[in-house]
């Protein structure tokens, strides 16, 4: 890579590898404005009911293509060279797990996506080992309940069920990791010197990292029978890990790595204890910054690492509530039952009616996450009458996202002793004005939407820009993004009455099996 001119702007790139797409975005370190980007959709593979996979090589190819295409766009649209990039950060879908051979560089099985439910039987076997089948028995170490959601069960399933994984383990060539590890290993050389690392935010979603030591825990690894040598080295969220090994961005340092929801916390400037954000994408994820305190939830939330910006800085912890199905419910309306032809029809269709007609939709397609943690829950639609129209069901699907967010907000208020007085939001779905208004109405607090909704990528870029040796950003100088505010418009009585019926519908979803 050619040296950068003294007059060239300092730009920071961010790889945003999500459930539905891979992207590369470039931001100005002076203004935080996005300069250029490229995006490629990523398909999910569903070989059996409850199974959700993605092809690791397809994801990696998409990331390389995004880097190449953005380099071209920078040149053609902005007359900028890639040597203006000071560093690259990574924001990735969490919990999704891959096993690969370090000699060949090839995946040994498709990546098991966070939504996947195949490990329900693995969970059942593990719970048989603990007193009273207590799924919270490890929370004092890792902050998480035993659930198919988290990576340890996915790794255990791969070790138990995939012959190629077993053979690589015997041969000493097996590596496992979440998607950040797969990306960084390939970007830094793959079989030819690739670095096998992860960061504290991604590691905190595996059930294998000790929240206090921020290292792989011997007791946890023993419980799941996962050899520690298979796992990546844990780093902070902001430091130079290595450099891009090839392509138009060869030599540019990779200087941050964060799970997408943690990156959004940073991108929203939720840096103070008590601040929170909710990201709306395939799922919905609400994180509450608890500062240096590890808060043990008694109301169905999980304790996780918020971020750690460099080896010499303190770790910030968070409480999190995760909703499995948010945007995925809209995709289901389109692809599975044909209620709409395009997702863009959903908002105008829901606006045709002023209420859901007392219809309640619980989209528990793969169980319910926080605060219920019911892996045997399945989707239900309640309250249908002969008057029910397509618009009512679509609006009920929209309201389901908002009700699930309220479930989490109420749990957070109980755990922290103080209710949130506002909700900062981000993610692609926040462009839906009706969804944002319903969220304000059903939670009873203002909803704050930034004009630049893709804050996960911005957070990864910020973490890269403040890394030691990069230092093109001062985190204290970064302004919170301009925003729109949605304020509640319904009475407290109406809000609480509808929420009571939602809780009734949720109870009806429990107890179903695949």
Placement of each model-derived feature along the sequence:
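N-terminal glycine/serine-rich phosphate-binding loop of ATP-dependent small-molecule kinases
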Residues: 1-109, 121, 140, 233-236, ...
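Carbohydrate-associated surface elements
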Residues: 116
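Active-site core segments that coordinate phosphate-bearing ligands/cofactors
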Residues: 2-7, 13-15, 26, 127-198, ...
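A structural motif corresponding to the C-terminal end of an alpha-helix
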Residues: 223-230
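Flexible loop residues that form catalytic
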Residues: 93, 239, 428
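Short secondary-structure junction motifs
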Residues: 21, 82-85, 229, 356, ...
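Structural motif
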Residues: 77-80, 226, 415
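Hydrophobic or amphipathic alpha-helical targeting/insertion segments
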Residues: 104-107, 113, 125-131, 137
């Amino acid at each position: 890579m050619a040296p950068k001119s003294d007059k060239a702007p300092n730009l920071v790139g961010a790889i945003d590898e999500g459930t539905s797409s891979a992207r590369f975005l470039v931001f100005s370190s002076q203004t935080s404005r996005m300069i250029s980007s490229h995006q490629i959709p990523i398909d999910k593979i569903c070989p059996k009911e409850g199974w959700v996979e993605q092809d690791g090589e397809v994801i990696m190819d998409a990331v390389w293509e995004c880097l190449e295409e953005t380099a071209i766009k920078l040149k053609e649209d902005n007359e900028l060279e890639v040597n203006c990039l000071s560093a690259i950060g990574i924001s990735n879908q969490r919990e999704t797990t891959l096993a690969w051979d370090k000699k060949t560089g090839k995946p040994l099985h498709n990546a098991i996506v966070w939504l996947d439910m195949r490990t329900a039987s693995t969970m059942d076997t593990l719970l048989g080992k603990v007193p009273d089948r207590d799924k919270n028995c490890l929370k004092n170490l890792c902050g998480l309940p035993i659930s198919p959601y988290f990576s340890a069960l996915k790794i255990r399933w791969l070790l138990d069920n995939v012959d190629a994984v077993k053979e690589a383990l015997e041969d000493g060539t097996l590596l496992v990791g979440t998607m950040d590890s797969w990306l960084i290993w390939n970007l830094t050389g793959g079989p030819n010197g690739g670095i096998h690392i992860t960061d504290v935010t991604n590691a905190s979603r595996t059930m294998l990292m000790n929240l206090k030591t921020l290292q792989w825990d011997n007791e946890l690894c023993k419980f799941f029978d996962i050899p520690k040598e298979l796992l990546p080295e844990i780093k902070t969220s902001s430091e130079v890990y290595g450099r891009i090994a090839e392509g138009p961005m060869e030599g540019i340092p990779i200087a941050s790595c964060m799970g997408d929801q943690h990156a959004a916390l940073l991108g929203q400037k939720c840096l103070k204890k008590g601040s929170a954000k909710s990201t709306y994408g395939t799922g919905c994820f609400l994180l509450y910054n608890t500062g240096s305190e590890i808060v043990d939830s008694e109301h169905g939330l999980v304790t996780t690492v918020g971020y750690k910006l460099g080896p010499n800085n303190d770790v910030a912890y968070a409480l999190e509530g995760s909703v499995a199905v948010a945007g995925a419910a809209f995709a289901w309306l389109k692809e599975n039952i044909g209620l709409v032809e395009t997702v863009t029809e959903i908002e105008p269709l829901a606006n045709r009616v002023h209420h859901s007609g007392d219809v309640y939709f619980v989209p528990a397609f793969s169980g319910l996450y926080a605060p219920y943690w019911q892996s045997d829950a399945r989707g239900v639609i309640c309250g249908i009458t002969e008057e029910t129209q397509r618009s009512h069901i679509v609006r009920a699907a929209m309201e389901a996202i908002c009700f699930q967010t309220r479930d989490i907000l109420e749990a957070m208020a109980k755990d922290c002793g103080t209710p949130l007085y506002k909700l900062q939001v981000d993610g692609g779905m926040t462009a839906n004005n009706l969804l944002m208004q319903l969220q304000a109405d059903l939670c009873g607090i203002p909803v704050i939407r930034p004009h630049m909704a893709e804050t996960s990528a911005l957070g990864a870029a910020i973490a890269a820009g403040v890394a030691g040796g990069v230092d093109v950003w001062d985190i204290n100088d970064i302004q919170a993004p301009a925003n729109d505010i949605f304020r509640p418009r319904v009475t407290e009585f109406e809000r609480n009455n509808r929420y009571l019926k939602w809780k009734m519908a949720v109870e009806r979803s429990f107890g179903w099996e695949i």
